[in-house]
Amino acid sequence: MAKNISRKEFLKATAMSAAGIGLLGAGVLNAKAEEEKPAHKNSSKWVLDSQNVKWDEEHDIVICGYGMAGTAAYIEAYEIDHNVDAVIYDKSDEANAGGQAIASGQCVIFVDPNDLETWRTYMRAMNEPHVIPEEDFNWLTNEFATDLPWIQAVLEPVDYEVGYSGGGALRWGTLLVEFPDLPGANFVGATGHFRDKNGGLSFENGGCWNGFDKAARYRGAKPLYEHQVICLVQDAITKKVEGVGVKKPDGSVIYTKARKGVLLATGGYEGDMDMYRQFNGGDRIYNAGSPYVTGDGVKMEMALGAQLWHMDGQTMSCGYFHGIKVPDFETTFIRQFYMKHGAWMEVAADGTRYYNEAKSYQRQHMKYYEHGKYVDVPIARQQPVHMIMDDNCFKAQPLVNAWIGWPVTCRNPYHWSEDNSVELEKGWIIKADTIEELAEKIGKDPAMLRAEVDKFNAMVDAGEDADFGRDIATMAKIEQGPFYAIEEVPSMPACSGGARRNIKGQVLNWDGEPIEGLYSAGEIGSLVCNLYQNGTYLHEAICSGRAAVDTMLGGRAELTPTFGGGAAAPWAEAADGDYSVMVQGLHDPFEVIYTIKDKKLVGIAVGEGRENMFMNDEQFAEFTKQLIDTQDMGVDAVSGATVDCQAITGGIMTAFSHKTS
């Protein structure tokens, strides 16, 4: 039987019921709000917060990129700890591996440890007006002078050697000096090249990366190709970089945690034309290297708030090479440096010549001297540029280099035809019966181009290039039809831009503090900031790859090859005989005669000008005995006779070195 209730009790019960429903509804709404609450969102697709990520894998070290820096980092990690768990992700497919390292000129600069300060003087002069922090500068220059034995030991098990890039043994004094007029350019060094000892070649295309790839695989490296690192993963609270997101070949994405650190060895941004537009001001700047180097690492660093540096400089350090871009390749060929026939010229947008096009600018990484400064060759400012030639020049040789540039150095290289006929058939080269017709086909004013060719031919007849001083020996009349044109574009083999790092390889924020967990190596964030000395980028990649791993693992691998290591003495390949050199004493010159037998220095004597020396006979005998006994120029000077000792060792470089510029 129902209980009778009063109106007051009814209202009280109803109110309590409504309150309960309200509380229940609020709970449901709050739960729904929690479900719909936005996840931690970073500012860019290039960085995700770890709070939103479920890890699929975990490794000690994550190496992003498998060029020179990536291979060096893996090798160093293995040599520190054979059980290290290091995973390597690379964006390219295996057939096109190697990054900018395989497309480069394949040179590595080494410095005699006994001449480190002279090398530093030269490096400072190249950097000006930019200043590299002293700690960074001293670290890098010292590495260039001390790590040759480590590199030799790395390559030894896979039968690769470090030789002179021009052929023969690596000897002190055999090198290319790009800026011989700068202070310190007389440093004692050597330009190295890595090559298969049994390959029979003095120069191996891609040899430097080939050697390090083999050395890394020998030590167990298993690079995962077609695995593109698409983002960094960072703790939203602590800001530590904890891992990466990786896009696999099938399109799926995995997240990999790094227990000790993430290494960005992804190269520069040569393959991203828009980044060149924004950072370097060029409307069309092409990539001469790997098509997979598209600035991904730089974009990740920017998304993190890393401190950028060397995005641009007084010059484009590696230089605007003259590229030839064709539809069949994403990156460019490099125009032939040494033309056998002189019936050619380059013209700018208006159909006129704009500089001495035949000079060997590649020896200064496409710089020339103007008003007391080295500046970039002006190809980027004169677009569109075309090379104009006659039939004699066209048939004389390939129009492109066969040893630098991605299309000719990758693992499946293109072989340009000897007479350019195949490329003409492909439509890569423009042909016309007359200069006027050629001008119309390439978008130049016919009358202007005709006048420029006539002017060029008249200067050939006169025996002088009155406009730009081109060596008349490199010029011939452009008169034998048909005529040809090929477009040239500014092309970059490398760039230095990226986030600043310290000598430990740690990427820095704008306060100069390390971003925990993130490291970089190689071209991305390079220390190179203005003029570029041949062999620097590849060597820096090796040094910085090692430094980052040393920091992560808290160790350092010290390796020595079985043969002792180092570079040979300058006289190591000299023929038997006497070599006479006039050297400069404190005030006046004197003659020094060096005797070589069986590739060894066996005698040093003084010829003319003995009276101009300050050292006495006893000091001379002591010093020369040290040189002969040690077969090493690094012996200490005799007290009281420093200037004469330096003159004698300097004479060795004059007598036996092979410096080019």
Model-based region annotation:
Residues 1-18:
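N-terminal secretory signal peptides and thylakoid transit peptides that target proteins
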Residues 53-69:
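Beta1/beta-strand and adjacent pyrophosphate-binding region of the FAD-binding site
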Residues 80-101:
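Glycine-rich FAD pyrophosphate-binding loop
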Residues 142-252, 273-274, 321-322, 460-480:
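Conserved redox-cofactor binding core of oxidoreductases
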Residues 249-252, 256-325, 538, 544-547:
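Glycine-rich loop(s) and the adjacent beta-strand/alpha-helix scaffold that form part
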Residues 298-300, 307-441:
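An anion/pyrophosphate-binding glycine-rich loop and adjacent beta-alpha core
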Residues 568-661:
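Active-site- and interface-proximal helix/loop "cap" or "latch" segments in soluble metabolic
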